[in-house]
Amino acid sequence: YTSLVLKYQVKCTGDTDYADRLYSVKEFFRIRTGEDAQQYLLDYDRTMNQRFDGKTTALNQKGVLVGIAPTDLEYETNTDGTIVAFIEDNQLWHYDKKEDEMSLVFGFADAENMDVRTLCDLHDIRLISVDEKGNTTFTVVGYMNRGVHEGQVGVAVYYFDAEKNSVTEKAFVPGEDGYYLMKEDLGKFVYYSNSDENLYVMIDGTLYLVNLKDNTREV
């Protein structure tokens, strides 16, 4: 049999509240061609996620309305729950409840960059920690769509300074394997120590120590 995956984006039209909202769609087909040259659909699955835009309509008294999204959305909060960082459709967002401010922290695709190059989804964003002030440490794993590491595969470690609203790259560890093998490796071991700012990460079967304080790494 043959397996096919289609990925594309659609936009709703009309006069409803959902008009002009963007959605990422993924369709999976498993097809078998019989001896009679007939094709048979063995399996089909379709998922659709709303592309979060951070507009004021996404906020209410209950919190952040992310729209159509996976139920296991990855997020981290500070201790008192006034600041939350969450990942939706390969974008990292930051919301400060006290200041009522929503910020797009990281995403290869944004309002100014929505071409084929930036929409390639062969990477994952993973939250490492969120401190009391909302400063966030996170990693980007896989293919780098744009930026100084464009075209490379690896693990980038970033630090978001909430007060300055700025993102700084702390380290980049290149990998030789593709995205899927790297994703499996990182799932086996990733650990961050807040006290000494050390990140331990497994890449291509090698365990790396990345110190975010002095921007160094060692095997």
Region annotations inferred by a language model:
Residues 15-17, 49-57, 96, 105-106, ...:
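A short, polar/proline- and glycine-enriched secondary-structure boundary/capping micro-motif
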Residues 97-100, 161-163, 211-215:
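Short loop/turn segments that connect beta-strands within beta-propeller blades
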Residues 105-115, 119, 170-173, 218-219:
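Trp- and S/T/G-rich repeat-edge/linker motifs of beta-rich repeat architectures
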Residues 17-73, 101-103, 162-178:
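Short beta-strand edge/turn micro-motifs at domain boundaries
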Residues 1-19, 123-132, 136:
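Surface-exposed, charged secondary-structure patches
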Residues 46-47, 94-101, 114, 138-139:
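Extended, regular secondary-structure scaffolds
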Residues 69-76, 114-131, 178-191, 219:
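Repeated scaffold domains used in trafficking and secretory/extracellular systems
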Residues 73-95, 126-150, 155-157, 188-203, ...:
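Short beta-strand elements that form the blades of beta-propeller/WD-repeat-like
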